[in-house]
Amino acid sequence: MAAKEVLFGNDARVKMLAGVNVLANAVKVTLGPKGRNVVLDKSFGAPLITKDGVSVAKEIELEDKFENMGAQMVKEVASKANDAAGDGTTTATVLAQSIVTEGLKAVAAGMNPMDLKRGIDKAVIAAVAELKTLSQECADTNAIAQVGTISANSDETIGEIIATAMEKVGKEGVITVEEGQALENELDVVEGMQFDRGYLSPYFINKPETGSVELESPFILLVDKKVSNIRELLPILEGLAKTGKPLLIVAEDVEGEALATLVVNNMRGIVKVAAVKAPGFGDRRKAMLQDIAILTGGTVIAEEIGLELEKATLEDLGTAKRVIITKDDTTIIDGTGEQDQIKARVAQIKIQAEESTSDYDKEKLQERMAKLAGGVAVIKVGAATEVEMKEKKARVEDALHATRAAVEEGVVAGGGVALVRVASKIAEVEVINEDQKHGVVIALRAMEAPLRQIAANAGEEGSVVANNVKNGSGNYGYNAGNDTYGDMLEMGILDPTKVTRSALQFAASIAGLMITTEAMVGEVKEDAPAGDMGGMGGMGGMGGMGGMM
C-alpha cells in the first residue's frame, strides 16, 4: 500500500479553501447577464467556449492533491444542482464558496464546527420553506419564455422557441435539442405518435413526390408476432374490402407470402394497405404496441393472451384520422382512443419513470409518455461555426431544463433577489447556542452572495447593490442587464424555484461537510526513478578484443 500524507486542523482547511477558491473563482465569472465566457482547452478539436458553470467546473483538476480535494467537493455541488434542476450550477458554486469561506473563518476563531453546521442546516430548512411561499405558478407562455431567456443568458430567441415548443407539445411533451444545419434556430414539431419504423416495402408508397405512404382514416391492426401466412389475414382483409377504408398493419414483422399478397392487393387497388414493423424490442415492444392500442382504440392481437389473428374482427382494430409512413418513420395522427384511458396510461408510465433507477429507461419512458400526451418537438440549434454551435446548444439545453423546473415548482424573482428576501424573513431561526446562531448568520450572508456576484460581474460594487435591494421589498431588485432597479417580475427576470432551492440545499450540504473536516489524507507522490545506464553493460565484452592483435 502506498504511503499517505496527512494534514490536520488549520493546515488541512487552508489547503481545502485554496482549492475551493480556484474552482469557484473560475466558475463565478459566468454568473448573470454580464457574466464572462470561459475557454476550455480540449485534447482534440477546437477549444470550447462556455458560460455554463458545471461545464467549467468539470474541467478543473488541480496539481496539489489537497487543494484538488477542495475543488472536487465544490465540483460535486455544481454536478448535483445540474442533475436535480439542470441549471443553477454557478449559483450553487457561489453559495458553497461563501459558506465554506465564512465557516472556516469561524472554525479558526474557535467555534464548534458541528454547531456551525447545525445552524446552517436550520437556516436552509427555513429558507426552503420560505421560498415555497414566495413561489408563483409559471403557467403562461410569456412567463415560460422569460425563464428560458434568463437561463440562456438573455437570448430572447431561445426563450421564445422553447415557449413555443412547450405550447405545441404540452408541458409533459418531449422536447429534444439537436445541432441544426442553418444559421438560425428552427423548431420541428411532430404531432401525434411517431416511432422509428418505416414501410416494409416501397410498393406501398402512394405519394411518390414525397416518397411516403399517406392513409386517411385508416384501420390499424396491431399484432405481437411475425405474420408470414396470408390465410391469417384473410378475414380482416375481406371485412376491410367492404368498408373501402385503408389498413395499417403494425407487427413484429410481415414477410414472405403475406407481404407479397399485401403488395399485390395494394397495387391492384383491391385494398389500400401498408405494413410496418412494431417499434422497440422484447418487453418494450409489447408495451409500445399497447400504447398504440390505447391511442387508437384498438386491441393488440397476441397469442399469449388468447387472441388469434385468424379470429380477429374489425372491432379489434384501432383507428386514426391520418397515418404518414416514410422510409424511416411512422406517424399516427389523431388516434381515436378514449381520452380517459390515454390519461390513465400516461399516469401509469409516469409512475414507472419515477420509480426507474436507469437513466436510459427513464428517458424511454418519458418518450412514450410524450408520444401519448401530445407529440415531440425538436429544437435545431443554428450557428455560424462549430465552436458557437456547441456553446449555443449548451445554453439551449440549460434554458430547457430551467423552463421545465419552472413549470414543475413555479418561479421566484430572479437576479438573486429571492434569496435576499428569504434571508430577511428567516433571521430569527430558533437555535440553542451562540455557535449555531453564527451558523445561521453564515447561511444568511451566503444568500446575498449570488446578487453581489451578479453586480460585480456587471462592473458594480456588490455591497452597494445588495444594500439597495435589501432596503426595498417584495420583488424589488437590480437588473444587471440594463443597470436599473425595479420589480423583477415585471421586468421578466424570473428564476425557477426548483433551481434556487436545489442550489441552496446542495451548496449547504457539501459546504457543511467541508467546515466539519479536521484531517485530510492523500497519497504521497513518489518521484519516478530516473532510468539507469544499464543498457551500456554489454560493452564489457570488449576486453576480449586484445586477442585479435
UniProtKB/Swiss-Prot annotation:
Keywords tagged on the record: ATP-binding, Chaperone, Cytoplasm, Isomerase, Nucleotide-binding
EC number of the protein: 5.6.1.7
Catalytic activity: ATP + H2O + a folded polypeptide = ADP + phosphate + an unfolded polypeptide
Protein name: Chaperonin GroEL
Organism field: Shewanella sediminis (strain HAW-EB3)
Superkingdom of source: Bacteria
Major localisation: cytoplasm
Subunit structure: Forms a cylinder of 14 subunits composed of two heptameric rings stacked back-to-back. Interacts with the co-chaperonin GroES.
Subcellular location: Cytoplasm
The protein's role, per its UniProt record: Together with its co-chaperonin GroES, plays an essential role in assisting protein folding. The GroEL-GroES system forms a nano-cage that allows encapsulation of the non-native substrate proteins and provides a physical environment optimized to promote and accelerate protein folding.
One function term, GO molecular function aspect: unfolded protein binding
Catalytic EC class: isomerase
Family annotation (InterPro entries): Chaperonin_Cpn60_CS, Cpn60/GroEL, Cpn60/GroEL/TCP-1, GroEL-like_apical_dom_sf, GROEL-like_equatorial_sf, TCP-1-like_intermed_sf
